[in-house]
């Protein structure tokens, strides 16, 4: 009896740290001071502290976070399997892909993971075991993980082999592959969850925009992992700012200043392609630089509040500290000034340097007040119009899976996030173009650039688009010299 009662608890404790990172909780920033929600005139969040996750999903599905469509029924049947079970395929078995798969299984719907793909078999096997452990922790039926050996695919073409075995596909491979994977999923008629960013260059952005239009035509739900659009404290905050709570927005300040991310050293026997694929964060054809891969979250919030995209950008950046042989070609800091059509500005900072001040947030200044942090709105006199306590809010990483799978299970077409995600990706890429070149970069020029970062051929023996010199160093962008358009 003792073992039956306490073994599940011990398992949970043993996996607590791993699970927090896997499911995205470790990425949710903490407020430095306790805040209380005191905005009484908008009912959607008046009782937020009393809501559980399922109740929140019901309410937030009517809010303006992701691109929510008027509900319409899907043509024919809701999903291709012709049963009550929603089959899910996972493409990209890293930490975020694994976390998304677990959250899909926890969505409250009859979801079964039926196929997996990754460039590397060890990543796939590790992901499979982590998902299995999470199912045990949450006491879910073991048959939710139904991936036979013949449905475990590796290599560059694994994504194509996953698609016949699923109704919904989770796309979480490195961002450089996202346009190709998304276009194939839409062509195959699959509902999609895909991680941000959705491209690393302008041709990729255009491919995603075209696939987004096709997904709309086919009534395929698409949710993108810009999870702030599914986060309680952001939903009401942005709604009030859009309604003019601080007047006209004059400036936005958005930040992702942190110590950086993982790095994988070159191993004996690796081809150059395998090394770059393993260490993908540090190569633009795979990642797009951290202004794109990470800072897109904050840039997207700026666009969301403004309900617009910038028309031009200029800035500066460089590679001052993080400049080892395994740090590829990306910068360690960027500062960009974006301008919108109405003349307002968004000032953007992102930095990956250990030992520096940590700041990951967004703030806005208006003609009659300010929004100094997510969930807080002040009048010019200092009166707090909004002060939201986020401690009991649902995990937005879970919410985005809940709403997607609820729509699919109910046969509804409700979510079309891809177009906005492509345009916020282009916002980030404009910033990179500006810092790499030292030039003013305009939206139309960036969108129509023909400069592709992707390799001509994807194979383990093929050369990647950027190669090291004899000393093992990669070419680094030089402002005033580097061409970006």
Regions found by a protein language model. Name each.
Residues 5-7, 14-18, 28-51:
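N-terminal secretory signal peptides
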Residues 48-64:
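N-terminal secretory signal peptides and thylakoid transit peptides that target proteins
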Residues 59-63, 67-68, 99, 293, ...:
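C-terminal helical cap and adjacent loop that interface with cofactors, partners, or active-site loops
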Residues 63-142, 231, 302, 483-485:
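N-terminal Rossmann-like dinucleotide-binding module
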Residues 92-97, 217-224, 228-328, 338, ...:
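Predominantly a Rossmann-like dinucleotide-binding segment in NAD(P)-dependent oxidoreductases
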Residues 135-171:
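A structured beta-alpha segment of the ubiquitous adenosine-cofactor-binding alpha/beta core
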Residues 179-230, 244:
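Beta-strand-loop-alpha-helix segment that lines the small-molecule cofactor/substrate pocket
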């Amino acid at each position: 009896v003792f073992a039956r009662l306490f073994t599940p608890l011990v398992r949970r404790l043993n996996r607590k740290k791993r699970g927090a990172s896997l499911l995205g909780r470790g990425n949710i920033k903490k407020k430095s001071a306790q805040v209380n929600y005191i905005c009484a005139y908008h009912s959607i969040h008046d009782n937020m502290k009393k809501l559980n996750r399922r109740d929140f999903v019901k309410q937030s599905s009517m809010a303006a976070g992701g691109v929510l469509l008027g509900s319409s029924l899907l043509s024919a049947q809701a999903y291709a399997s012709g049963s009550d079970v929603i089959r899910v395929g996972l493409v990209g078995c890293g930490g975020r892909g694994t976390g998304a798969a677990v959250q899909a299984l926890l969505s409250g719907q009859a979801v079964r993971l039926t196929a997996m793909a990754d460039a590397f078999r060890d990543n796939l096997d590790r992901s499979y075991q982590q998902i299995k452990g999470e199912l045990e922790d949450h006491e879910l039926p073991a048959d939710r993980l139904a991936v036979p050996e013949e449905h475990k695919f590796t290599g560059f073409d694994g994504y194509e082999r996953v698609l016949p075995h699923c109704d919904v596909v989770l796309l979480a491979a490195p961002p450089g592959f996202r346009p190709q994977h998304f276009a194939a999923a839409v062509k195959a008629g699959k509902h999609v969850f895909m991680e941000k960013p959705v491209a690393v260059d302008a041709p990729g952005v255009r491919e995603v925009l075209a696939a987004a239009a096709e997904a709309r035509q086919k009534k395929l739900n698409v949710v993108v992992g810009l999870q702030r659009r599914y986060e309680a404290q952001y939903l009401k905050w942005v709604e009030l700012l859009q309604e003019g709570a601080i007047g006209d927005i004059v400036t936005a300040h958005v930040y992702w200043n942190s110590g950086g991310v993982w790095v994988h050293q070159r191993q004996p026997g690796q081809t150059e392609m395998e090394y770059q694929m393993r260490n993908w964060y540090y190569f633009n054809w795979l990642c797009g630089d951290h202004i794109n891969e990470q800072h897109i979250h904050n840039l997207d919030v700026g666009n969301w509040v403004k309900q617009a995209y910038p028309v031009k950008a200029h800035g500066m950046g460089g590679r001052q500290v993080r400049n080892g042989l395994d740090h590829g070609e990306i910068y360690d800091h960027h500062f960009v000034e974006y301008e919108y059509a109405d003349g307002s500005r968004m000032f953007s900072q992102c930095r990956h340097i250990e030992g520096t001040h940590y700041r990951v947030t967004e703030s806005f200044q208006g003609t009659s007040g300010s929004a100094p942090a997510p969930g807080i709105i002040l009048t010019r006199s200092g009166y707090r119009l909004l002060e939201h306590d986020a401690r009991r809010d649902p995990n937005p990483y879970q919410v985005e899976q809940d709403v997607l799978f609820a729509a699919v299970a109910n046969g509804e077409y409700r979510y079309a996030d891809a177009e906005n995600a492509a345009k916020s990706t282009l916002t980030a890429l404009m910033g990179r173009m500006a810092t790499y070149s030292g030039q003013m970069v305009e939206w139309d020029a960036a969108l129509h650039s023909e400069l592709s970062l992707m390799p001509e051929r994807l194979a383990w023996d093929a050369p990647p688009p950027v190669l090291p010199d004899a000393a093992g160093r990669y070419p680094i962008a030089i402002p005033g010299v580097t061409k970006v358009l």
